[in-house]
């Protein structure tokens, strides 16, 4: 029986034999043409595999190996689960002893705390009672010092002895109780030690038993796994032997076929050689006759060439004399040119020295300019830092001033609302409701609405496309987004799906493996999010630019884009306004070939990179805040009380002034009335005093008979 390791090596060798290394173009390459070629080769390999499968040439060994692997994997998983369950149960059985010991210790500590608390309370009570008794004995000793009668002293001494004996007896009793409790604790400690030793023995027994069970189970499962691998090995040997026999039969058949074809080819070659020999003989005779004729013609030409040679020799002698004279003239000219070259060399040396001086001067100027440039850059950065600091301070002060003015304005508005409420409810008797304006809930400077991100727009597009796909057969109208040329959500979704399928090289392999168990829409959403991150598409405008770029690229590069494509393009063009009727309809994404997606993406990325090549001035401050709605906001705060209410307040103010005047006059009259009443009371008192005098009773006609005295 072979060990499992050798079987694993055989499986690895078989996998290496079945899966040769890929030496051609890769789909992960940076070159688009190489990726396209790799895709084409992969498609061709799939077609070849389908053809072989149809012809019965498919390798059945791979399927058998997968089945065998599934059997061994199943056996290993069963063994792993069984062993894990056994280890878990054994661990729980062993740890139960520790858990029980911990619970007993917790209960013991709780009881010990309670007993300790009771003991302390008992000792405190004993101390208090003993102190009271001791104080009582001490007081009686002081009283005994004051007594002088011996009998009383004797009685007092006996009483003091009794009290002291009682105090000592209480102390001895407490000591005996504490000693008894200490003895019980010693006994309990011995029992706990015995219990712990018993628990340790039990723990060791269970651990030994668990180790034996685990070892036994491990051996049994190992035997089962070895049996499963041995069965797989036998099946693999049988299948390989069958494949080898089939391969030998096919090889023998091909050898026989090759031998028959070779015999036929030898016979055909012999016939062709005979024909070639006859044709070569005929051609040889023909060439021989032709060459003899050519020899005669060449002899005639040789005679003519001799005559021509004689004539040319005389001409050459004459030309030699002419050239000799010209050589003498060229020697004179050459000497003149040498003198001229020497003068030019002197001029060149002077120019070189001047050039070196200029280069040195320019280098010094360059160094000085470079140092000035660095100094200016540092000053510029410091200026940038200061301007950013002042910008932040200005923003902070602006917000503080805004909040202060806003709080003051809202306090005044609340006071105005309180006045309006009091006037309406108390003076006019009308119901009053607090107004609800948008600017009353605002706190701080007014901020503009943020732009949507590309992921949010993508979710909306997928949702709209699902709704359109559900109503595609029964609905004739489409929902359009705010995309260029009023492109439908379905068209946008097709473009994005095509982009997602053809730009997988922009997504990491780990992310692709994590996206497999997800749903289709979630998978598309996450993949497109990764593609957008790689392309630098962040917001709504960038997504619209990408879709518009796809449509424009297809319009300029497709010859059939000048004609109406389908009924959907007609519907899209009919929804655009009057100006858009003169424009061309948007092309259908069905006409965009998948191989053109990479070219379009490359052109789009290059168009995004072009503006970055130019120098852009550094942005010193953050974007200028939009203050177009500030004046509207503050004017709205000043108009919270309408003009009708202000007119009502003016009329009420006039009426209240009149009412105040009447109340003032009434108060003055009340003061005058009270002064008159006081004077009247004083006069009545004087009159009563006059009437009550004794002189009036002596008169014949008293004043009380002449007039009636008014009573108060």
Swiss-Prot record:
This is Dynein regulatory complex protein 1. Component of the nexin-dynein regulatory complex (N-DRC). Interacts with CCDC65/DRC2, DRC3, GAS8/DRC4 and TCTE1/DRC5. Residues 100-388, 663-698 form a coiled coil. Pfam families: NYD-SP28, NYD-SP28_assoc. GO terms for biological process: axonemal dynein complex assembly; cilium-dependent cell motility; regulation of cilium movement. The keyword Secreted does not apply. It comes from Bos taurus (Bovine). Residues 1-34, 557-591 are annotated as: Disordered. The gene is DRC1. Keywords: Cell projection, Cilium, Coiled coil, Cytoplasm, Cytoskeleton, Flagellum.
